[in-house]
Amino acid sequence: MKRRRYVIGILLCVTALLQAQDSVKSFDEFFVAGMDKIDGVFPVYVAEKEIYLEIPEKYIGREIEVSGQIDRGFDLLNRPVDGLGVVRIISPDKATICFQKPFYTERILDEKSTYQQSFSLSNMQPAGKSYPVVAYSKEQGANIRITEYLMTGDDWFSYNDNFIRSLVPELSEIMKIHPFKEGVSFTVRRYH
């Protein structure tokens, strides 16, 4: 019985892996007519109501900060909210980007250190939140769909105050995309 479960589990994993590999589009299929590209450190692609973030290849393995704030509403002005925080961008395969929240009791910042290999083996990290790669840009940057994380999700930032009503997702919208020297910011209007 256990052997049958293992075989079924392996078949499911192989099927999921093959589906994930087929889901990555070519850049020409991805970049449709009417799509705009906003250049920056992390280029952003906008097509109608869909937002895609490009993770350049040189940022795989690096850390970024994901945070948010309420600018106004509910008697809150410029109030920080719970954000994803500092995450490491990893790519376990060509079809996935993960935001890993590293947990270290100690760190080695020099990647050429003689202790780096033993340190990485003794500090295995959880995979983190994974995002399917939609397409790769001509510069080999991985494009991930981030629309729902900005508009309705609470993965990247959340606010759990009792006086904030429930979200009305169909009225929420992206107001502005602002690339700057170190990253990109989004102004999102969420209706509650």
Residue ranges of model-derived segments:
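Bacterial N-terminal signal peptides that target proteins for export
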Residues: 1-7
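Basic/polar N-terminal segments that are highly enriched at the extreme N-terminus
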Residues: 1, 20-23
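Hydrophobic h-region of N-terminal signal peptides that target proteins for export
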Residues: 11-20
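Homeobox/homeodomain signature
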Residues: 7-8, 34
